[in-house]
């Protein structure tokens, strides 16, 4: 199980500060949310990958589709994933839309902002991710209580499944994800990138208490 610091990629100076802050908070990964970069030119994120690695952090590159919570659909999305792949980073793409895995280590993800997935949907999508050879499968969903959340979690057939409950008042469920064995656990070091997101420091404390860092 790993702690991931999700960083909106806006201003380079701010991104640098948040990477350093993520390392100090005990994160294992930083997620660079490139869809926050609202310029037409490709963001200069390769130097940020190098900086993160200098601080002992692995890197996830995400250009989230607007239909699943992204800021916008940039013209350089494909190019950014190619660059991330060449740099050896993890790439996060939507399981419902991908045609081929953009990186050797790819996360196939799905997001439900209005209501939880139908029964069996997580099983179907996780099976697709597994058969595609995805490094991990991620589900972010609105949820109201622990029993329904546990049922959704238990549907996944992918051995590396990350679950993120979303919505107001789900902070405790976020921390409980580690108890269920969520492979990746996302937190913030500044601006939250998802509703209900807790801080990375809270996550690392929870994971350390469980003695469950790593695979």
Swiss-Prot record:
The active site is at residues 111, 138. Its EC number is 4.2.1.10. It comes from the Archaea. It comes from Ignicoccus hospitalis (strain KIN4/I / DSM 18386 / JCM 14125). Homodimer. Involved in the third step of the chorismate pathway, which leads to the biosynthesis of aromatic amino acids. Catalyzes the cis-dehydration of 3-dehydroquinate (DHQ) and introduces the first double bond of the aromatic ring to yield 3-dehydroshikimate. Pathway: Metabolic intermediate biosynthesis; chorismate biosynthesis; chorismate from D-erythrose 4-phosphate and phosphoenolpyruvate: step 3/7. It catalyses: 3-dehydroquinate = 3-dehydroshikimate + H2O. 3-dehydroquinate binds at residues 6, 31-33, 64, 174, 193, 197. Signal peptide: none annotated. GO terms for molecular function: 3-dehydroquinate dehydratase activity. InterPro entries: Aldolase_TIM, DHquinase_I, Type-I_3-dehydroquinase. The keyword Lyase applies. This is 3-dehydroquinate dehydratase. Belongs to the type-I 3-dehydroquinase family. It is an enzyme of class 4 (lyase). Keywords: Amino-acid biosynthesis, Aromatic amino acid biosynthesis, Lyase, Schiff base. GO terms for biological process: 3,4-dihydroxybenzoate biosynthetic process; amino acid biosynthetic process; aromatic amino acid family biosynthetic process; chorismate biosynthetic process.
């Amino acid at each position: 199980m790993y702690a991931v610091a999700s960083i909106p990629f806006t201003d380079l100076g701010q991104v640098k500060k948040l990477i350093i802050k993520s390392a100090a908070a005990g994160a294992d990964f930083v997620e660079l949310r490139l869809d926050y970069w609202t310029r037409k030119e490709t963001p200069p994120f390769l130097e940020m990958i190098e900086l993160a690695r200098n601080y002992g952090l692995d890197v996830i590159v995400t250009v989230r589709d607007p239909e699943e919570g992204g800021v916008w659909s940039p013209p350089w999305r494909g190019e950014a994933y190619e660059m991330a792949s060449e740099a050896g980073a993890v790439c996060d793409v939507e399981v419902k839309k991908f045609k081929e895995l953009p990186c050797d280590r790819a996360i196939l993800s799905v997001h439900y902002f209005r209501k939880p997935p139908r029964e069996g949907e997580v099983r179907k999508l996780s099976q697709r991710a597994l058969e595609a050879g995805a490094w991990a499968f991620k589900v972010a969903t609105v949820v109201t209580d622990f029993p329904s959340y546990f049922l959704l979690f238990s549907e996944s057939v992918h051995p590396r499944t990350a679950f993120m409950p979303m919505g107001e008042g789900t902070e405790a469920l976020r921390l409980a994800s580690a108890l269920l064995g969520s492979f990746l656990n996302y937190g913030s070091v500044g601006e939250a990138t998802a509703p209900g997101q807790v801080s990375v420091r809270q996550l690392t404390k929870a994971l350390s208490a469980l003695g469950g860092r790593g695979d």
